[in-house]
Amino acid sequence: VIKKNNWENISFVNYDCFNKETYKKINYTPNIVIISGVFELFEDNNMLENTISGVAEILDKNGAVIYTGQPWHPQLKQIALVLNSHKGHGKSWLMRRRSEKELDSLFENYNLKKEKMLIDNNGIFTVSLAELR
């Protein structure tokens, strides 16, 4: 898409965001990082903290992180019965819901303070903006 539209000063990189070593490979300083739709996949907050700490280390001093949350879902059990685990053990998978308070505190541990949040009309999806302090 970037090449097709002849956009400049935009880059897309695909790495393992849960691996702390990933962030040492990134040779630029982003001013915006988007973390969307991945935290619900994992129960372990340590994995999330690897991501958040890595992002905070490379983020521009005036940078921001946009992150999504899914604190509730009306079809949680149905989703678990239909989707197998992404971990490959063939068992049903249950989405790890996190409250906004829990998500915000994970980001605040790395000096990223939530400034704004939007939530859909059903209270299922959130989009938050955190700025580096």
Role assignments for model-derived ranges:
Residues 1-25:
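S-adenosyl-L-methionine
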Residues 7, 43, 59-61:
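Helix-to-beta-strand junctions that scaffold the AdoMet/dcAdoMet cofactor pocket
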Residues 48-61:
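A short glycine-rich, Lys/Arg-flanked "PGG" loop and its adjoining helix->strand segment in the class I
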Residues 62-70:
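Conserved beta-strand signature within the Rossmann-like core of class I S-adenosyl-L-methionine
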Residues 110-133:
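Core SAM-dependent methyltransferase catalytic element
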Residues 34-37:
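A conserved beta-strand element that flanks and buttresses the S-adenosyl-L-methionine
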Residues 76-93:
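Short, glycine-/aromatic-enriched active-site segment of Class I SAM-dependent methyltransferases
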Residues 93-111:
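Short alpha-helix
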